[in-house]
């Protein structure tokens, strides 16, 4: 199963990538901003699943979803419960 991680905190991205690799996911890329994620998702075949942090350094992941129709399953990874209803 292929995956993309959208996470701006480097240690969190590394931990998630390691965890996914242990469970036979192929992590295609770890992206750390709305801008990079939007560009990558517009230019590449979408993975089976996208793991997205909600708060990123240059905005939030909902901006990505407004710009790109993502055909993948999405798992939101965040410590902020105020985003639960939006997600």
Regions inferred by a protein language model and the residue ranges of each:
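Conserved SAM-binding loop
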Residues: 5, 30, 76-77
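Alpha-helical elements of the RecA-like P-loop NTPase motor core of helicases
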Residues: 14, 39, 85
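Structured loop/turn residues at beta-strand edges in well-structured enzyme cores
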Residues: 23-25, 44-45, 70
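CheY-like receiver
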Residues: 47-87
